[in-house]
Design a protein with these regions (language model features):
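N-terminal beta-rich core of secreted/periplasmic extracellular enzymes
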Residues: 21-181
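Bacterial Sec-dependent N-terminal signal peptides
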Residues: 1-23
């Protein structure tokens, strides 16, 4: 009798262990809420892996966590389009694609059209090029207003009018996001 009971308990315990081993971690389960998935991924990461996610591994990229299946993130800063691919250890072109990148007009030119639909199309075109070049993040557009003519980044903004900039930047970003960037 005791032997049968021990065998049943062993089978019962083994089935739970096997189920636990086959369970999908919460961070990989799309049915779970985003906050729960993020918390689970952070819980499973080492301190070194967390730092690596926040720290660049090269120009315009951040390391992933291969152990957990989290991929690298590639970015582009091009305020006038998507920057061509550059080498890891220099500013030379990496020649990953056999074409050249597009140069879009400065954002002040876009804002001067007062056309949110054009801003959305502009953003979508940049998003499509970013996708083609395997960029997941675009570091822009710059959402600021001119306060000083001496600001060396003014060319990245949509001008001095905060109302106009706010009306133009939203469709621009929505256009970029349509491409999954």
């Amino acid at each position: 009798m005791i032997k049968k009971l021990l065998i049943i308990l062993f089978i019962f315990r083994t089935s739970f262990v096997l189920q636990a081993q086959n369970a999908v971690p919460a961070y990989l389960d799309p049915a779970k809420p985003l906050e729960e998935r993020v918390e689970n991924a952070l819980l499973l990461m080492t301190v070194e892996e967390k730092v690596a996610l926040c720290h660049a591994q090269s120009k315009f990229s951040s390391a992933g966590v291969p152990r957990l299946g989290i991929p690298e993130v590639w970015m582009s800063d091009g305020p006038h389009g998507v920057r061509a691919e550059i080498e890891w250890d220099s500013w030379g072109y990496a020649n990953f694609t056999n074409d050249s990148c597009l140069a879009f007009p400065a954002l002040t030119c876009l804002a001067s059209t007062f056309n949110p639909e054009l801003a959305a199309r502009y953003g979508q075109a940049i998003g499509e090029e970013a996708r083609y070049r395997n960029k997941e993040v675009i570091l822009g557009p710059g959402v600021n207003i001119y306060r000083s003519p001496l600001n060396g980044r003014n060319f990245e903004y949509m001008g001095e009018d905060p109302y106009l900039a706010s009306k133009m930047v939203v469709p621009y970003i929505q256009g970029v996001q349509k491409s999954g960037v």
